[in-house]
Swiss-Prot record:
GO terms for cellular component: small ribosomal subunit. One of its GO terms (molecular function) is zinc ion binding. This is Small ribosomal subunit protein uS14C. It comes from the Bacteria. Zn(2+) binds at C24, C27, C40, C43. The keyword Mitochondrion does not apply. Belongs to the universal ribosomal protein uS14 family. Zinc-binding uS14 subfamily. The gene is rpsZ. Binds 16S rRNA, required for the assembly of 30S particles and may also be responsible for determining the conformation of the 16S rRNA at the A site. Part of the 30S ribosomal subunit. Contacts proteins S3 and S10. SUPFAM superfamilies: Glucocorticoid receptor-like (DNA-binding domain) (SSF57716). Binds 1 zinc ion per subunit. Pfam families: Ribosomal_S14 (PF00253).
Amino acid sequence: MAKKSMIAKNKRPAKHSTQAYTRCERCGRPHSVYRKFHLCRICFRELAYKGQIPGVKKASW
């Protein structure tokens, strides 16, 4: 879990466009965040297995 101060800092608008970075909206993790879903890989996997992300299912080939 991210510190509350870091999550609050991320919600503020950046002074410059290059300062903006993605953070997981569920847990606040800064690394391995899928931009389309705004979730980190760990949260994405949990929610996908539960079927809470529409249009996402486990791949099989």
